[in-house]
Amino acid sequence: MNIANYTLKVKGKTLLQDTDLHFSSGKINHVVGKNGVGKSQLAKDFLLNNSKRIGRDIRQNVSLISSSSNIPNDVSKDFLLHFLSKKFDAKMIDKIAYLLNLDNIDGKVLIKNLSDGQKQKLKLLSFLLEDKNIIVLDEITNSLDKKTVIEIHGFLNKYIQENPEKIIINITHDLSDLKAIEGDYYIFNHQEIQQYHSVDKLIEVYINE
């Protein structure tokens, strides 16, 4: 995915100015940045097109998974899986559920009573079943326990290996993502998206901002 000279303004504030967006398929494209720089606005723009630069071919082919993405919370995991089985291919459900290790989640407990990590796994399943080619992850490991973060890292590594046609954009401020998941590395900095080929160099720049 390539968008040249991309500018994003929200409520009169310029977040990105004449920067080039280039995200590759078959790998995780990490975009890191400090709180408040506009990372979530960038994530939303792939769907909402506030910039007027996101083409219909992109907007119609994006799944955005963020803290504001919701699944029903007054049903159980078993009910959710049954509901999803009416809309999506059973083999795909089983495959993603296996990669997410969903068997460890009690199928009878209401989703609202599950841990944040368990809810996030069910959210990943629900949205990835849409099978869109562009997947935007907005702070999906934020506030999760370390064990769940490690499991999600492992899941993303396996998922992209098995789905090399996908473009996954991981918007985060969790630097552990960069070490745990190999990919391309970008920083949201000074109204630009800048690529770094060295994880250590990017982390150094990020810390010293």
UniProtKB/Swiss-Prot annotation:
Q: Which UniProt keywords apply?
A: ATP-binding, Nucleotide-binding, Transport
Pinpoint the ABC transporter domain residues: 1-207
Cellular component terms, GO, for this chain's entry? ATP-binding cassette (ABC) transporter complex
Entry keyword annotation includes Transport: yes
Instruction: Supply the Pfam families for this chain.
Output: ABC_tran
GO MF, one annotated term = ATP binding
State whether keyword Transport applies.
yes
Induction, as annotated: Transcriptionally repressed by rok, this was not found to be the case in another study.
The record's statement on gene disruption is: Up-regulates expression of the LiaRS two-component regulatory system; this effect is more pronounced on modified competence medium than on rich or sporulation medium.
Complexes and interactors:
The complex is composed of two ATP-binding proteins (YydI), two transmembrane proteins (YydJ).
Q: What is this protein called?
A: Probable peptide export ATP-binding protein YydI
Organism name: Bacillus subtilis (strain 168)
Q: Lineage of this protein's species?
A: Bacteria, Bacillati, Bacillota, Bacilli, Bacillales
Gene name?
yydI
